Amino acid sequence: MTLFSSISSMSTSMSGSKSSIASFGSGTSMGSNSIACGGGCGGSGGILGSGLGLGLGLDLTGGSRSRGACGNGGNRGNGNGGMGGGNGSCCGGPCCGI
């Protein structure tokens, strides 16, 4: 769970951002002014499985097909950690309530 610890601290440091969110495969979320989207679309979901993304468009899914919590702009969850839009769409619907 070292990876999760580092992600948690990163999320905490970004909590001042309006769109900061950590989304999990179960659909629960931590953050403000946001709508969770089950951790992604097309992946197995869950922290260890594939689906943790941060609301700033960061893709931390490690190469899975799931998308980040907030749509990830043009990156579409290829695991490269690219920055995308913070208010994109997820599974065809709105994913960030900002």
From Swiss-Prot:
Region (Disordered), start-end ranges: 1-21
Pfam families per UniProt: Coiled
InterPro entries in UniProt: HssA/B-like_chaperone, HssA/B-related
GO BP terms: sorocarp development
Similarity field: Belongs to the hssA/B family.
PANTHER family named among the record's database cross-references: HSSA/B-LIKE PROTEIN 1-RELATED-RELATED, HSSA_B-LIKE PROTEIN 1-RELATED
Name of this protein: HssA/B-like protein 39
Species this chain originates from: Dictyostelium discoideum
Gene: hssl39
